[in-house]
Amino acid sequence: MIKDYKFDEIAEIFTGIRVKRYQKGITVKKKILKKTYEDSSNIETEDVQVSEDINPKFYSRKDDIVILLAGSTVSKLEKEGIIIPMYYAVVRVKEGFDVDFIYHLLKSDIFPRELHKIVEGTTLKIIKTTHLKEINLPIPDYETQVEYGRLFKLMDKRINLNQELIELERQNEKLIMKNLLEKLGDN
């Protein structure tokens, strides 16, 4: 059975931190999430010098979901301890809901359709976390979430492996061409 939930009923949702405020005084090197417009689990980070006074809630936890507020890109974080900057909404799924299912629901056609109703701006669409919290999402019972969450996670792994295979094939193609040209050049 599917039930509609407001987004803030299934997850804690808040905006990341304004990093520049923490770059004065005594600082340490930390990883920060880079802005990305690609839907992916392959998250890029960069090193920045920041104060150690940053509230722990702004550091990533395993299975955090982040949504880029200026483009609605949805990503799932596997690594802990990465600073999440203010141009991301952090989604921490509450107990009783499956993280993998919620992540894939947010990547589905349903979420962008609901999001389209609330975004502001003409040229650059901006998402506000207060509006995000009001989005209605259809959620099945927990067992169904877990079952399909596992399926989607396995499908993601297969997609990533196939992408790696494609990249290896491209490298092989270049290497074969290079070897051919070297061989023909020796004659």
Task: Give residue ranges: language-model regions.
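Short Ser/Thr-interspersed hydrophobic loop/turn segments at strand-loop and sheet-helix junctions
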Residues: 7-19, 32-41, 58-75, 105-115
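Short alpha-helix capping/helix-loop boundary micro-motifs
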Residues: 49-56
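A short beta-sheet element
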Residues: 68-106
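A general structural signal for short secondary-structure boundary/capping elements
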Residues: 76-81, 110-117, 133-139, 152-153, ...
